[in-house]
Swiss-Prot record:
Organism: Arabidopsis thaliana (Mouse-ear cress)
Gene: UGT73C3
A Pfam cross-reference name: UDPGT
GO molecular function, one term: UDP-glycosyltransferase activity
Binding site for UDP-alpha-D-glucose: 297, 357-359, 374-382, 396-399
Keywords in alphabetical order: Glycosyltransferase, Transferase
Protein name: UDP-glycosyltransferase 73C3
Length: 496
């Protein structure tokens, strides 16, 4: 097998990576592991057995190609907080009531990880930890090594949260959850409701304790790496870097480290569709004619809304791929598709993927001309990197923030019209936010031939080209990885 190494940087560096147990956090962290290993860094990834199994194939190929990547397992402490066995990932949790126990259980990994670190050889030079794992700060301090935080968000989001944490009185003065307020001292004029914010800036109870630990761990870390590129959001990269005293390295889009078809197809998990079958279907369609529809690995839309989405796609008369997470929750949807004749009616121009989809593989195909997305940061960046304009359908978390960046700032997408956060446990009460006519209208606005649609396609194609240049030798993200390694190398030499 051909080697993945681009060139040796310094073989004595050893980075230990701690991905958070959520698909959207793990996927880019595995890409980061490969990017650093390609520079000659020894990598150790610490995670639980169930989570390690999700990226086993991709990492095995990387290791076979000559990259120095090791995986160490720690047992997940289910029993201490009453979690069912096997619930090692956010997407496996059945209710929001399990979220706080899950985060508390995660922090109990501190002691077993401390023991692993004591036995680790060569001695680690640096930790890269997901923001959601604040216990790693204690470990870094104990071993006197730098800890770098990885968020899984872009700089637009990170700067927004930084500004609001320092202006909490703004949130206190907002009279209701529906009232919009202006983010102060921001490069662009952007408004949000409190519920649309990436994380609760003014959380209470157990969540406040958890959030406070995360924020403290972030601000006491050595620096931050971000899956973005400078050319995508220049004023936000600049201002966030200043806010963090310069120790911010934008190294994305990290998904571009997946060059082989197999790596693209199995990124995150094994796909629910055969790679060749998927590509043959796409090959049969005209360039730019297919809308790719995927609302993420934790989509909580109610059945009534999913039906309207399906009917809107049908009435758009456009070819589409619709990814529907294969779980018990969607059994009723699959039954409706069969019983109503939906699946039969759309079979010539619609491809349904029930489960995990090879997203990067699909988005990079020339037949795809639009992406209806929940605006998770990975999906947002992967769409832009592929030069694909977006229909934004945010659900919760950082997704409304990403929508503002895409639609208002970058002008690389159109909104489906969702303003309300899809609260866990209240989905059916919220009901339908976008009916089939709204879906059809958004698809036409994005995929049609209006001057606005053509300009949008031009802009996002340009951004996609800039993304690829950023990761090439001499590009901004490639150079930032070099600067990061030089920084850690100097620290290591100073300590020795």
């Amino acid at each position: 097998m051909a080697t993945e190494k681009t060139h040796q940087f310094h073989p004595s560096l050893h980075f230990v990576l701690f991905p958070f147990m959520a698909q959207g956090h793990m996927i880019p962290m595995i890409d980061i592991a490969r990017l650093l290993a390609q520079r000659g860094v020894t990598i150790t990834i610490v995670t639980t057995p169930h989570n390690a199994a999700r990226f086993k194939n991709v990492l095995n190929r990387a290791i076979e190609s000559g990259l120095a990547i090791n995986i160490l397992h720690v047992k997940f402490p289910y029993q201490e907080f009453g979690l069912p066995e096997g619930k090692e990932n956010i997407d496996s949790l059945d209710s929001t009531e399990l979220m706080v126990p899950f985060f508390k259980a995660v922090n109990l990994l501190e002691d077993p990880v401390m023991k692993l670190m004591e036995e680790m050889k060569p001695r680690p030079s640096c930790l890269i930890s997901d923001w959601c794992l604040p216990y790693t700060s204690i470990i870094a301090k104990n071993f006197n090594i730098p800890k770098i935080v990885f968020h899984g968000m872009g700089c637009f989001n990170l700067l927004c949260m930084h500004v609001l944490r320092r202006n909490l009185e703004i949130l206190e003065n907002v009279k209701s959850d529906e009232e919009y307020f202006l983010v102060p001292s921001f490069p662009d004029r952007v408004e949000f409701t409190k519920l649309q914010l990436p994380v609760k800036a003014n959380a209470s109870g157990d969540w406040k304790e958890i959030m406070d630990e995360m924020v403290k761990a972030e601000y006491t870390s050595y620096g931050v790496i971000v899956n973005t590129f400078q050319e995508l959001e220049p004023p936000y990269v600049k201002d966030y870097k200043e806010a963090m005293d310069g120790k911010v390295w934008s190294i994305g889009p990290v998904s571009l480290c997946n060059k082989a078809g197999a790596d693209k197809a199995e990124r995150g998990s094994k796909a629910a569709i055969d790679q060749d079958e998927c590509l043959q279907w796409l090959d049969s369609k005209e360039e730019g004619s297919v809308l790719y529809v995927c609302l993420g690995s934790i989509c909580n839309l109610p059945l009534s809304q999913l039906k309207e989405l399906g009917l809107g796609l049908e009435e758009s008369r456009r070819s589409f791929i619709w990814v529907i997470r294969g779980s018990e929750k969607y059994k009723e949807l699959f039954e409706w598709m069969l019983e109503s004749g939906f699946e039969e009616r759309i079979k010539e121009r619609g491809l349904l993927i029930k489960g995990w989809a090879p997203q990067v593989l699909i988005l990079s195909h020339p037949s795809v001309g639009g992406f209806l997305t929940h605006c998770g940061w990975n999906s947002t960046l992967e769409g832009i990197t592929s030069g694909i304009p977006l229909i934004t359908w945010p659900l919760f978390g950082d997704q409304f923030c990403n929508q503002k960046l895409v639609v208002q700032v970058l002008k690389a997408g159109v909104s489906a019209g969702v303003e309300e956060v899809m609260k866990w446990g209240e989905e059916d009460k919220i009901g339908v936010l976008v009916d089939k006519e709204g879906v059809k209208k958004a698809v036409e606005e994005l995929m049609g031939d209006s001057d606005d649609a053509k300009e949008r396609r031009r802009r996002v194609k340009e951004l996609g080209e800039l993304a690829h240049k950023a990761v090439e030798k001499g590009g901004s993200s490639h150079s930032n990885i070099t600067l990061l390694l030089q920084d850690i190398m100097q620290l290591a030499q100073f300590k020795n």
